[in-house]
Regions:
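Aromatic- and carboxylate-enriched substrate-binding clefts and catalytic-loop regions
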Residues: 1-111, 115-117
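Generic beta-strand/beta-sheet core signal
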Residues: 5-10, 44-46, 191-195, 219-221, ...
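Conserved, mostly hydrophobic/aromatic
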Residues: 43, 131, 190, 254
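Solvent-exposed beta-strand/loop surfaces of large extracellular or lumenal domains
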Residues: 218-244
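C-terminal beta-strand-rich structural cap/linker in extracellular carbohydrate-active enzymes
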Residues: 237-264
């Protein structure tokens, strides 16, 4: 049978009565979650009311939107989410629980809506899988846009269930660096993102296990990457690191860096 349902609502008024965030909507959302729990169905709720921590009572609510997500880059007349958007929401909306932002796009323009685009580089899309927490993730692009691209390996590898989380460095609205440990393996993952400004960051690896070596699989913005003119440029490399090392990371404008650490 069906074990997971993603819900979504297209009308401004539910049943032509009240807005999603009215009392009618609040009762409806709660009823959906309770009924789904009865049948052991997990929910990914889009267009929800403000997150309140209800997943503590109903853990089948795996994740929900409740944020100006990446879909706004596809059609929003205001140009979509600005580059600094994802450097803010982990520290605001993210405090209220998991959010389904729907990142993972490799094709950055939308021919159906001329003038719209995803306002990041490819590597920032990868890094968001670490920066923004959701126990259910998706790859938001078409399958053909991933074919033959090494960067898709990171999306296939990155888990959604974490054992430890550290904010290694951040300035809200400018940049952030998150490190998370996979709950089911000894692997660590790091995501670094920046706003419209290119920047260089030093990432200390003190969160790794002492006296152990790791293979770092690094997906970084290319030297010529730029979110408006060359968002798909990236480079991949591997190196052996330990907890005493510090990685120097270069981020393009609205860029990112995604790293997987595999314990040897």
């Amino acid at each position: 049978g069906v074990h997971v349902v993603k819900t979504g609502y297209v009308n401004r008024l539910m049943d032509f009565k009240e807005a999603h965030d009215g009392q009618y909507g609040v009762r409806h959302y709660r009823k959906v979650i309770e009924t789904a729990a009865k049948y052991q169905i997990a929910i990914d709720n889009h267009e929800p009311v403000m997150p309140t921590g209800i997943e503590r009572t109903w853990p089948n609510l795996m994740t929900q939107e409740g944020v100006r997500g990446q879909e706004h880059n596809a059609w929003s007349p205001d140009g979509g989410n600005p580059p600094e958007h994802t450097t803010v929401i982990p520290f605001t909306r993210g405090l209220a629980g998991p959010m389904d932002f729907t990142f993972g796009t490799f094709n950055f323009t939308n021919e159906a809506y001329p003038g719209t685009r995803v306002n990041t580089t490819l590597c920032k899309q990868l890094a968001l899988f670490v920066v923004i927490y959701s126990p259910l993730q998706m790859a938001s692009d078409l399958p053909e846009n991933y074919k033959g691209i090494k960067a898709f390996d990171f999306i296939k590898d990155v888990p959604t269930d974490w054992d430890k989380t550290y904010v290694v460095d951040a300035k809200i609205g400018d940049y952030s660096v998150f490190a998370r440990k996979d709950r089911n393996t000894s692997d660590w993952y790091v995501g670094c993102i920046t706003d419209e400004n290119a920047r260089e960051l030093d990432v200390p690896l003190s969160f790794l296990d002492a006296d152990s070596k790791y293979t770092a699989q690094i997906y970084a913005d290319g030297d010529d990457a730029e979110w408006k003119t060359n968002p798909t440029s990236f480079k991949y490399g591997e190196k052996i690191v330990t907890a005493s090392d510090t990685l120097h990371v270069k981020l393009a404008t609205s860029g990112g860096c995604a790293i997987r650490f595999i314990k040897q």
